[in-house]
Amino acid sequence: MRNPNIFLALYVTGSWIWRQRMPMAQCLKSCVCSDYEPLVKDAVQLPVVDEGRVTAAVNVVKLFLPDCLSVDDVLKSRDELKKLAQARNISKILAKSATAIHIARGIKCPKGTENVLRQTLVDNCTVFKSMYSVLAYLYLSPGADTDGMIDQVVAQTADRTIMLGDMTVLSHAMRVDGVDIPHSSQDLAKMGLSAADSDTLDPIQLVGVMEPPSPPPHTADAREDAPHVSPPERRPQSSATLTSLDAKSRRGLAGQVPAS
């Protein structure tokens, strides 16, 4: 005779498997093929093209390229677009040079290094003028061949160009909280502004970069070699002359007083 408990156990187990068939299938699916699930087409949204922005961009390009009437014309004008990109790079260099010159007007540097900075600023002004000329040439000469010209100008002036970052670092090194601070010769040597064995007196005196150079001091030898000029003799004036001068000065002061 068969044991009825076996049939009861099989019935309960089969019922539980039947009730858990969907969760088990999803579990197997997530473990085996989760990386290969197909995308739901309804959830994919294509980017919406803003025609207003496209039209505005075309209108901006038309300011520089009057012959372009559509986006296709702009894409075909690769040479003109290259020229515009070059002009944009030159404009960035011009902006940095102008800002560096403007910042240099208010900063101070250790005495003895102002000549180097002044010469650098002069070279920077030369770069500014050269780049401005090239930029004007690009805008005023449509269809001109500019290959190599800009690279040549940049190569000739790159080693002499002082940029905004250099001026900002220098200005920050010379000032703390808006107050000029003195530097020792060792500090200047660490910043690469002077040699460590230079005969520089401490503390370093700060001078303006844009200030005109002071005239050289007169030495004792120069004063000895200079011809001696005696001061003019002062002749004694009579009392009548002094009285007349005193009266004239009083009348002059009376004429300068505004009438009430």
From Swiss-Prot:
Region described as Disordered: 208-260
Phylogenetic placement of the source organism: Viruses, Duplodnaviria, Heunggongvirae, Peploviricota, Herviviricetes
Q: What does this protein do?
A: Plays several roles during the time course of infection, including egress of virus particles from the perinuclear space and secondary envelopment of cytoplasmic capsids that bud into specific trans-Golgi network (TGN)-derived membranes.
Compositionally biased residues, Basic and acidic residues: 220-236
Give me the stretches of Polar residues compositional bias: 237-246
Question: Is the keyword Manganese in the record?
Answer: no
Organism equals Psittacid herpesvirus 1 (isolate Amazon parrot/-/97-0001/1997) (PsHV-1)
* Localization in the cell: Virion tegument; Host cytoplasm; Host Golgi apparatus
Q: How is it modified after translation?
A: Phosphorylated.
Instruction: Note the subunit structure.
Output: Oligomerizes. Interacts with UL7; this interaction mediates UL7 incorporation to virions.
This protein's source sits in the domain of life called Viruses
Q: What is this protein called?
A: Tegument protein UL51
- S-S pairs: none
The UniProt entry, under InterPro entries, shows:
Herpes_UL51
To which protein family does this belong? Belongs to the herpesviridae UL51 family.
Keywords for the protein's UniProt record, in alphabetical order: Host cytoplasm, Host Golgi apparatus, Phosphoprotein, Virion, Virion tegument
What are its GO cellular component terms?
Answer: host cell Golgi apparatus; viral tegument
